[in-house]
Regions:
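N-terminal leader/linker segments that initiate helical-solenoid repeat arrays
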Residues: 1-81, 90-96, 303, 309
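Residue at a conserved register position within TPR or TPR-like alpha-solenoid repeats
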Residues: 29, 67, 105, 140, ...
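Solenoid-like repeat scaffolds
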Residues: 8-14, 46-52, 84-90, 119-127, ...
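Generic helix N-cap/helix-start motif at coil->alpha-helix transitions
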Residues: 15-24, 53-60, 90-99, 125-135, ...
Length: 314
């Protein structure tokens, strides 16, 4: 059995002799992908005086699957709920149905219902698998109970340090709970272990660093990502380089501001980064370079050409 510690006594799952034909007919409809037929057969079977708990639970769970195949998630949840209430399936099937119900409730954004279902599932099965606990954390996050969600994720990540999906969901929950330093720490540890291999993952870390005003670390992550080919040159990366440049400028770090604008400008969608580069170079007394950047800004297109022309006229 999948749930050896379950508190529920697994019933003897047997069809009543009087309903076997109906169940077989239902199975045939299912195999023909006649989902509506399966559902009406399940309703019919559920109303039979001769149907036992197993018959009803089996029929309703099949109707739930049929509804899910029709993309009618609300109906699927109704039938999976009826299957659980009929209480006639063996433990493995009963709890698989209950878990399915929780997943559908979550997908339908019925987070309170999903939480009640998953809590019942965990209490009765005494199962504590990482994916089940992570699902519960996701439900809590859906209810904006981010502190509780974050605590579960942190515990799970400690036990499963190489599970990247767990990590990114945990980071999202921590950010939702406004625990930004904790989120950064998780990302940092994963980064040091070489786990962050996709642009959005690296971006989560360097944007986290930017928000924490840890500019040099942010720059290192960006540069490393570009060197490894994870971050591709383009408008989005240009935007992030410009944020680094603006911050360097605000902190009177002219050399860094110039370096970051120089990286942003060629890959930006328009000439605004070149214009900003020209302004910073001009303020830094680098007139010839400023003029070259202003010319590039005009070539690429900017909102206020007069700003570039002013630098060129000096």
């Amino acid at each position: 059995p999948m749930y050896p510690n379950a508190t529920r006594q697994s019933p003897e799952a047997k069809a009543s002799p009087k309903t076997i034909k109906s169940l077989q007919a239902m199975q045939e409809l299912y195999e023909k992908d006649d989902w509506a037929g399966v559902i009406s057969k399940a309703d019919e079977l559920g109303g039979m005086a001769s149907a036992n708990a197993y018959d009803k639970a089996f029929a309703y769970s099949m109707a739930g699957n049929a509804a899910a195949n029709m993309n009618d998630q609300a109906k699927a949840a109704t039938y999976f709920g009826k299957a659980v209430d009929a209480n006639g399936l063996d433990n493995d099937s009963h709890y698989a149905t209950m878990y399915n119900l929780a997943i559908i409730q979550y997908g339908e954004e019925k987070y309170a219902d999903a939480l009640a279902t998953i809590d019942r599932f965990l209490a009765e099965t005494k199962s504590g698998k990482a994916d089940q606990l992570a699902f519960r954390a996701g439900v809590l996050a859906g209810l904006n109970r981010n502190d509780e969600a974050a605590a579960i994720y942190k515990d799970l990540i400690n036990k499963n340090p190489t599970d990247k999906r767990l990590l990114m969901n945990g980071v999202a929950a921590l950010q939702g709970a406004e625990k930004f330093d904790d989120a950064n720490k998780l990302l940092e540890q994963a980064y040091q272990r070489g786990m962050l291999t996709e642009p959005r993952e690296l971006r989560a870390l360097y944007i986290g660093y930017m928000n924490a005003q840890r500019w040099t670390e942010a720059q290192k992550v960006v540069d490393d990502g570009v060197a490894k080919g994870i971050l591709q040159p383009g408008p989005e990366l240009a935007r992030d380089y410009q944020i680094l440049a603006q911050t360097a400028y605000a902190n009177d770090n002219m050399p860094l501001a110039i370096a970051m604008y120089k990286r942003a400008a060629p890959m930006a969608a328009d000439g605004e980064a070149y214009l900003n580069l020209a302004k910073v170079l001009d303020m830094d007394g680098k007139k010839a370079e400023a003029k070259a950047a202003a010319k590039s800004a005009l070539d690429k297109g900017i909102k206020k050409p007069e700003d570039a022309k002013r630098i060129l006229a000096r």
